[in-house]
């Protein structure tokens, strides 16, 4: 792949074409009452992904992940949602895990308000991602225009990615609000995240608007 000419040597070393082959095994238990906008129940997932080895390719690692989403109905059709995800990537035979396969958080599906979150390289602002990650999301979803399938959401996000550790005292945080619409072309989300701790290098903005077509994370 192409990289910026001002990127660090670590990132430049991964320029060019690479290939990887991986297989994923997932176990999911879903008791939620709706596939798009659930209001009660839980969804638990554990997964293992292996790349390289007999599958060949340039990458050689095993990735472990787990998540738990819980939804609780409240009066007036309000829904409280609590979500947590954790992940770990283990390299094999000393093969460096490519930046594209490491955990880089930020954006509407992890830490809203941030562009990129994760370990940087050489004291620069180049986020190269981590081998461990943890994300927590808390949401309050309120009906807005029931006939049109529109909802309002207020949220709090916390999480980070690290190299070879988890640090609960080092979580990036944001709060925000948005609107969700189950439109004829699918679920639409427009949300603004305000960064509570801007950090030293990872992200200079105070927050950002984000839009996506698809299911909530």
PLM segments and residue spans:
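An acidic- and aromatic-residue-enriched active-site/binding cleft used to recognize and process polar
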Residues: 51, 159, 193-195
């Amino acid at each position: 792949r192409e990289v910026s000419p001002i990127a660090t040597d670590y990132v430049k070393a991964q320029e060019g074409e690479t290939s990887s082959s991986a297989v994923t095994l997932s176990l999911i238990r879903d008791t939620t009452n709706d596939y798009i906008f659930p209001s009660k129940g839980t969804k638990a997932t554990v997964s293992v992904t292996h790349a390289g080895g007999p599958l060949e390719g340039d990458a050689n690692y095993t990735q472990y992940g787990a998540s738990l989403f819980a939804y609780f109905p409240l009066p007036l059709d309000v829904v409280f949602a609590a979500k947590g995800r954790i992940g770990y990537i283990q390299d094999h035979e000393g093969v460096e895990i490519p930046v594209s396969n490491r955990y880089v958080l930020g954006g509407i599906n992890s830490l809203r308000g941030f562009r990129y979150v994760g370990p940087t390289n050489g004291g620069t602002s180049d986020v190269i991602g981590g081998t461990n990650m943890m994300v927590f999301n808390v949401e309050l979803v309120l009906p807005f225009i029931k006939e049109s399938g529109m909802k309002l959401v207020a949220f709090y996000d916390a999480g980070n990615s690290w190299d070879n550790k988890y640090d609960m005292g080092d979580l990036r945080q944001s709060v925000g609000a948005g609107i969700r619409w189950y439109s004829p072309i699918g679920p639409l989300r427009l949300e603004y995240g305000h960064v509570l701790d801007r950090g030293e290098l990872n992200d200079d903005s105070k927050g950002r608007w984000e839009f996506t077509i698809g299911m909530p994370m």
